[in-house]
Amino acid sequence: MLEGAKSIGAGAATIASAGAAVGIGNVFSSLIHSVARNPSLAKQLFGYAILGFALTEAIALFALMMAFLILFVF
């Protein structure tokens, strides 16, 4: 019973990975639209996009960490 609950909890924690994938897609789609509107700001916008990517990917890594904690610690 406890093993099943752990698996369900870990699966629920990894749902955040789908949200992170959508967020990363939004970051880079916004970058493409912004560079298409104003190509002279491409270098500055790329820096912002990489920052947005890193922050969004951190959410997925935290979710993965929580899934491992649920599976192997609790």
From Swiss-Prot:
Q: Record's HAMAP family?
A: ATP_synth_c_bact
Biological process (GO) annotations held by this record are:
proton motive force-driven ATP synthesis
Tell me how this protein assembles: F-type ATPases have 2 components, CF(1) - the catalytic core - and CF(0) - the membrane proton channel. CF(1) has five subunits: alpha(3), beta(3), gamma(1), delta(1), epsilon(1). CF(0) has three main subunits: a, b and c.
Name of encoding gene: ATP9
Q: How does it sit in the membrane?
A: Multi-pass membrane protein
Q: Please state what the protein is called.
A: ATP synthase subunit 9, mitochondrial
Q: Which SUPFAM superfamilies match?
A: F1F0 ATP synthase subunit C
Family annotation (InterPro entries): ATP_synth_F0_csu (IPR000454), ATP_synth_F0_csu_DDCD_BS (IPR020537), ATP_synth_F0_csu_sf (IPR038662), ATPase_proteolipid_c-like_dom (IPR002379), F/V-ATP_Csub_sf (IPR035921)
Mind naming one GO cellular-component term on file for this protein? Answer: proton-transporting ATP synthase complex
What does it do?
A: This protein is one of the chains of the nonenzymatic membrane component (F0) of mitochondrial ATPase.
| Source organism of this protein record | Glycine max (Soybean)
